[in-house]
């Protein structure tokens, strides 16, 4: 008697269905299958979009754009001023150039110009350059003209001197009708507005460091001074300056350490608010260096002359012994002073000369902008 072969799918309990019945499934139309697949795809798409929307709305909100806490339209600008002084025709033109830059950059603060009391605003003829420049400063650039006594500028030189050595900038401390005065050396190129300095935290003075002397000394540089005018401070500084005014001390002609810097450091070295020199104290001599650790304050940043210039608010012309840019220099000296290229300098294959290009552009720009002044003759000195 043979055994009956067991089926692969035995009968279910309480079920009359057989294996043949299980596979007896009617054919489903292709259209119905396609519709079912589309519904599944649509469901997954909807689910994915839903998840994306949840993640989108839960994302971290972007930081708001920085907004100045000062509404410049509501500022009483008559309480703030920039100051300049002139000890010669050359420096008078420089001062006018600074006023032109401030005007062009949209500064709304007052402008004050100290000048020798023996000058006047009467233009006698076409050769009376000083009077023409004073009128230009007053009428076009709305400068307040303040005559000063000869003793305040006798430490300075004439038009042919490249380096001004007077202490007339200290007069800005006596302008007590203003809440704050910003004094800028006139041998600069102003690149960006600096009106934000009027709203620094309270401090008698704010100055950048003479960073080129770091880390050996932490001398403050007088190329830019933010001042809270005070009769007490003015009187104290004038008393300190008496030896220089009366010829009892020799005023140094070297740009690296001037007498006004010495006076200001003696009084404010430990109390001044220090301004970042990258923005407010850059000097042209930095583009001639290969070691920029004093400028950066570290040894890991990479020097990029274009980036450095873009961050600067002003640049001070300081390339001793090269004279200032309004003085024609000897070509031999100029060749020695020019920034060196990074690769094979002095050869036909030299490359990496961007420092030189930026440095030359600063001097060329200064001379080009000097056309704002009535025809000032080019000065020749022992250098040219």
Curated annotation (Swiss-Prot):
Known glycosylation sites: 254
Location(s), subcellular: Golgi apparatus membrane; Vacuole membrane
Topology versus the membrane: Single-pass type II membrane protein
UniProt KW keywords: Glycoprotein, Golgi apparatus, Membrane, Signal-anchor, Transferase, Transmembrane, Transmembrane helix, Vacuole
Residue intervals annotated with topology Cytoplasmic: 1-39
CDD domains in the record: GT8_GNT1
Segments crossing the lipid bilayer: 40-57
Gene3D superfamilies: Spore Coat Polysaccharide Biosynthesis Protein SpsA, Chain A
UniProt-listed SUPFAM superfamilies: Nucleotide-diphospho-sugar transferases
Enzyme kind, highest EC tier: transferase
GO MF: glycosyltransferase activity
GO CC, alphabetical: Golgi membrane; vacuolar membrane
Positions on the Lumenal side per record topology: 58-384
DXD, short sequence motif: residues: 185-187
Record protein name field: Glucose N-acetyltransferase 1
Provenance organism: Aspergillus fumigatus (strain ATCC MYA-4609 / CBS 101355 / FGSC A1100 / Af293)
Lineage start: Eukaryota, Fungi, Dikarya, Ascomycota, Pezizomycotina
């Amino acid at each position: 008697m043979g055994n009956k072969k067991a089926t692969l799918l035995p009968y279910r309990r309480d079920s009359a269905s057989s294996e043949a019945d299980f596979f007896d499934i009617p054919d489903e139309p292709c259209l119905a299958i396609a519709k079912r697949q589309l519904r599944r795809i649509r469901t997954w798409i909807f689910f994915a979009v839903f998840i994306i929307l949840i993640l989108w709305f839960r994302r971290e909100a972007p930081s708001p754009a920085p907004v100045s806490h000062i509404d410049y339209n509501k500022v009483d600008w008559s309480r703030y001023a920039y100051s300049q002084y002139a000890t010669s025709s050359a420096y008078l033109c420089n001062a006018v150039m600074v006023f032109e830059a401030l005007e062009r950059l949209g500064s709304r603060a007052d402008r004050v110009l100290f000048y020798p009391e023996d000058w006047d605003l009467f233009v006698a003829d076409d050769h009376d350059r000083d009077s023409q420049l004073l009128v230009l400063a007053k009428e076009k650039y709305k400068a307040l003209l303040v005559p000063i006594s000869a003793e305040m500028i006798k430490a300075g030189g004439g038009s042919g001197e490249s380096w001004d050595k007077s202490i007339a900038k200290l007069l800005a401390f006596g302008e007590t009708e203003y809440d704050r005065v910003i004094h800028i050396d006139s041998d600069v190129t102003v690149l960006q507005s600096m009106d934000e300095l009027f709203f620094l935290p309270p401090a008698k003075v704010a100055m950048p460091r003479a960073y080129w002397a770091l880390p050996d000394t932490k001398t403050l540089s007088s190329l830019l001074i933010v001042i809270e005018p005070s009769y007490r401070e003015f009187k104290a500084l004038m008393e300190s300056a008496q030896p220089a005014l009366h010829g009892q001390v020799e005023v140094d002609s070297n740009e690296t350490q001037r007498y006004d810097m010495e006076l200001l450091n003696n009084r404010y070295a430990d109390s001044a608010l220090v301004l970042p020199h990258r923005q407010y104290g850059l000097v042209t001599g930095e583009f001639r260096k290969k070691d920029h650790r004093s400028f950066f304050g570290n040894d890991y940043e990479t020097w990029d002359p274009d980036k450095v210039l873009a961050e600067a608010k002003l640049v001070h012309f300081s390339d001793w012994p090269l004279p200032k840019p309004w003085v024609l220099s000897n070509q031999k000296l100029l060749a020695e002073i020019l920034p060196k290229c990074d690769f094979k300098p002095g050869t036909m294959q030299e490359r990496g000369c961007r420092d030189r290009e930026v440095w030359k552009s600063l001097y060329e720009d200064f001379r080009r902008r000097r056309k704002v002044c009535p025809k000032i003759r080019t000065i020749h000195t022992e250098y040219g």
